[in-house]
Amino acid sequence: MKRAAIRLWTLNKGLLTHGRGLSQGSQYKISEPLHIHQVRDKLREIVGVSTVWRDHVKAMEERKLLHSFLPKSQKVLPPRKMRDSYIEVLLPLGTDPELRDKYVTVQNTVRFGRILEDLDSLGVLVCYMHNHNHSTKMSPLSIVTVLVDKIDMCKHSLSPEQDIKFTGHVSWVGNTSMEVKMKMFQLHNDEKYWPVLDATFVMVARDSENKGPAFVNPLIPENKEEEELFKQGELNKSRRIAFSTSSLLKVAPSSEERNIIHELFLTTLDPKTISFQSRILPPKAVWMEDTKLKSLDICHPQERNVFNRIFGGFLMRKAYELAWATACSFGGSRPYVVTVDDIMFQKPVEVGSLLFLSSQVCFTQDNYIQVRVHSEVSSLDSREHMTTNVFHFTFMSEKEVPLIFPKTYGESMLYLDGQRHFKSMSTPVTLKKDYPVEP
């Protein structure tokens, strides 16, 4: 068994060599970016999985042999720098018509759902580069996305005919978790790459069988800029803990929030009846229950990740597309995505599962639409449904949208939760209309 494991850990000749060609500065530089197709290829190479579904069981059995190579403590692992995990990836939409067809919409815009898939794959590869052992090929770690903390759109001018570039690196490290900062740029007519979005993902390392936690290499900042990034990672962790502690699933709304719900309730009472039971909808308003859209997908092997679970990027794409359709149907015009935040991957989705998505508008303000998507799965053999994800998307419409009114206490909690996510959004941006981002 051990000999077989050593055979699997042969010297690596084909993997990325991180740290080479980087120069310290406000942004790291590399000699040659990866093509977007190489990202998944590198992940398969690092994990050592088969590209053929029928061989997946054998490939996973081989990974069991790597369990003995996991470190017993983080102290035995060499510290890494942010430059060690830095990667640039090119999405050549301008020069590859076949690839462009995968990303273009009927309105000649870019499918943001595809961008979410690319960000998820890039985040995992960045973490493998942080933990890469130069003398080995296959990694004993199983690195998975646990949280999409925030994706902020800083420019909404994505053209399907101009190249896109992604960059990413590890910005904070705990014992078994890592925060990844990623940016996206697009080439413009001035031959310069302009920023499009900033993304923060949280990844966790697990053992070779993806059954328990595993230690990751510590991170050492090299300068003040990196120290600030690392401190921000600590603050993000504290913020997430505080947000979870104050969840409406755990504690009652604040007094201010209770007043908001009561005012909404009073606004919907019929003045003719003077009764708590008679409800009417105010002008230019919509009941929350009337904004729902649902979808069902069968999770085929084609959508699996390198660990033979359903690819997290696929789940995000399907959720986003349903959310966009919900916002479009509600607002009456094509919406623009502004922010994606707080996507927690609570449970893995197995191949063969039935994926149920339910989307609804839960909060609106002026031109903004806050959409929540609930994801749950069931197996073909069981009727039991389990929640896997809750997605939060903030959209902006070209025109002012109707107000949302809840009817029940449960819907009132969804309203307050949506309001909280909306308020956590960065400063509202002015959206450009030349190439809006669509699914």
From Swiss-Prot:
Gene3D superfamilies: Hotdog Thioesterase. The modification N6-acetyllysine is found at K102. Widely expressed. Pathway: Lipid metabolism; fatty acid metabolism. Residues 85-209, 289-401 form the HotDog ACOT-type domain. Belongs to the acyl coenzyme A hydrolase family. Keywords: Acetylation, Hydrolase, Membrane, Mitochondrion, Mitochondrion inner membrane, Repeat, Serine esterase, Transit peptide. Mitochondrial acyl-CoA thioesterase. Catalyzes the hydrolysis of acyl-CoAs into free fatty acids and coenzyme A (CoA), regulating their respective intracellular levels. Shows a clear preference for hydrophobic short-, medium-, and long-chain saturated acyl-CoAs with some activity also with short-chain dicarboxylic CoA esters. Regulates both mitochondrial lipid and amino acid metabolism. It is an enzyme of class 3 (hydrolase). It is found in: Mitochondrion; Mitochondrion matrix; Mitochondrion inner membrane. Induction: Expression increases by more than 2-fold following induction of nonalcoholic fatty liver disease (NAFLD) by either high-fat diet (HFD) or genetic ablation of leptin expression. It comes from Mus musculus. This is Acyl-coenzyme A thioesterase 9, mitochondrial. It catalyses: butanoyl-CoA + H2O = butanoate + CoA + H(+); propanoyl-CoA + H2O = propanoate + CoA + H(+); hexadecanoyl-CoA + H2O = hexadecanoate + CoA + H(+); octanoyl-CoA + H2O = octanoate + CoA + H(+).
